[in-house]
Amino acid sequence: MARTDADDPTGLLRGAVGLAPTWDGFVYIASYQRGRIVQMSPQGAFSVLAGQGATAPGNAELPLLGPSGIAVDRNGALYVADASAFAIRKLNHRTADMAPDGAMTATQPPALVRTRPFPWPFAPQYGSHEVVGVMGEVRGDYEGESRDHLHAGLDISKPMGTTVLAVVPETVRDPLPNSRDLGGLNETLRIDQMTYVHMRVGRTLDDQPLDEARFQLIRNAEGHVVRVRVRRGTRSQVGDRIGTINRMAHVHLELGPPRGKVNALVLPFPGLSDHVAPRIDEVHLLDAQGRRLDRKLGEHLLVPALGGPLDIVAEAWDQMDGNAARRRLGLYKAGFQILKADGTPVRGFERPRITLEFDRMPLAPDAAKIVYAPASGDAVHSDQRTRMLYVVSNWARHGRTDRVGWNPADLPAGNYIIRILAADRMGNVAMSGRDLPITIR
């Protein structure tokens, strides 16, 4: 019905996993893929009650990451199980034209982030180690597409063969917690809230078991390991040996379930410090066809007032204390501000507009192409040097993404400054290279 019904042309019901009928003929549906609660009237018409696309004031901002169940109580209140956010939501669907009674605040990360200090996945677990990748960075696919996906975790560098240690006491809950690409670069183990990638699960580089009670190595007739079995219910404690790093020379650590990944930098790792401000290499504008604006009037970039929405692009990167000089990390948040020629903000831009924030992993399959402009890519997964060109006029926050753009027609003709906000997770902000003088006419 979601794909063919004329009343549902945008596929509102795609990924429908929960349904609740009411006494007066309405039906409420939880759309897991869309992150929405959909209302179907007795006449069969669809509308979005809550989540992205809702028209009721306040309801569009409700942070539904992965609604998986829904129920209506005897008083008409609607309860939503948001599996990806570890939360139960409540709203009154009878007053959907106003903010719901149970106004939903931003979801909280898993409780384990309160563990202080939080151990690293290598020895010494309470020492310090180099972070070489953060959430939200652009990644390619090894096959020519440089903006294939966004990086979902925290990369921590160590040589191939280093033993990976569990960072929290957890119990395996998934019946298939480890990936099937045995010996591959992306071999993975997910215990519960923590996922470990780029390691040989449960064994050394020469396929010797690390812990036979937890990891059962299945061998063929020639004695080669063909499968590693990890039983559901297996318990791991902090410091337990769970694998060894493969030739990727780092472990990729993810926090949260597949559709609810939280930025692992919320974990209070000991010895992790960052006093290095991000760097902005360049700021430029792209038109609707992806062409770069390059005409100038003196020192100002000439911007056609009626040329339509533009992409504001900032090439930027970051480092942490102790990073190698060649290291290029991604930003935690970015945005922009429009200033008058005298440096005062125009109306609506009294503060920088934060448009990109990697607190949670974006869910859209095209998120990398929304966040990053062409020419972005990384040196490992793409045939180029690492470059991150952020489209700060688009939207990517709290797991949601959208193509937005900036329309110069909203301003009177004249001289302005586009000022970029580029910040890391520790609050350091780029101060140089952030301004682009423009003339709108």
Would you name each region that the model predicts?
Residues 98-195, 202-207, 229-232, 237-241, ...:
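Surface-exposed, glycine-biased beta-strand/turn segments
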Residues 40-45, 92-95:
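Short loop/turn segments that connect beta-strands within beta-propeller blades
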Residues 15, 33, 66, 84, ...:
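Beta-rich catalytic cores
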